[in-house]
Amino acid sequence: MQGFVLLISGPSGAGKSTLLKKLFDEFEDELYFSISSTTRKPREGEKNGIHYHFISHEEFQKGIDSDHFLEWARVHENFYGTSLKHTQNALDNGKIVVFDIDVQGFKIARKKMADKIVSVFITTKNKDELKKRLIKRNTDTIIQLEKRLQNASDEMKELSEYDYLIINDELKQSYEALRAILIAHKFRTKGQNLGQIQNIWNEGE
């Protein structure tokens, strides 16, 4: 099987990380999580090389100049980017590469490898629910919270650009939807070596 990209977007606080953790718990051997590089400072509990590659603005700019990134974007005054080389190596090894990136990054990545991307937008049932989750998380100032909500409203305008939409209201139901999307795309003819399969089939005559 040829690898493909499972690209996840959605507002901060929509529950993407929780759903992806469940996905990796079940499909660990088949998945490769693309670890983004970022210029923001680590949050409590985050480790370099596990959650993100934390780099300086100067290092990030060098990556842009050398075409190191498959996609990159500026989010909340910081930069985030995904390594093109690491992504391609994982795809060549038949892995399902998981991206958790914003709408800006999705549009850039799609231009470079549209035929390999399956895109899913995950959000809450409404803006009030998202606000409750962000307040409960208690990691943002009031100004940061309002900016996240505005960014979420802007991203919601891009829903039609994505292949699938999951309203993450009930965790179990949302996970089953994400799981079904992954499984279905594993068996697409588009991603398989049909010539080899046909040869093996004919040899069995």
Swiss-Prot record:
Its EC number is 2.7.4.8. Signal peptide: none annotated. Keywords: ATP-binding, Cytoplasm, Kinase, Nucleotide-binding, Transferase. Pfam families: Guanylate_kin (PF00625). Residues 3-183 form the Guanylate kinase-like domain. ATP binds at residues 10-17. GO terms for molecular function: ATP binding; guanylate kinase activity. It is an enzyme of class 2 (transferase). It is found in: Cytoplasm. It comes from the Bacteria. GO terms for cellular component: cytosol. Transmembrane segments: none annotated. SMART domains: GuKc. It catalyses: GMP + ATP = GDP + ADP. NCBIfam families: guanyl_kin. Essential for recycling GMP and indirectly, cGMP. Belongs to the guanylate kinase family. HAMAP family: Guanylate_kinase. This is Guanylate kinase. It comes from Campylobacter jejuni (strain RM1221). The lineage of its organism: Bacteria, Pseudomonadati, Campylobacterota, Epsilonproteobacteria, Campylobacterales.
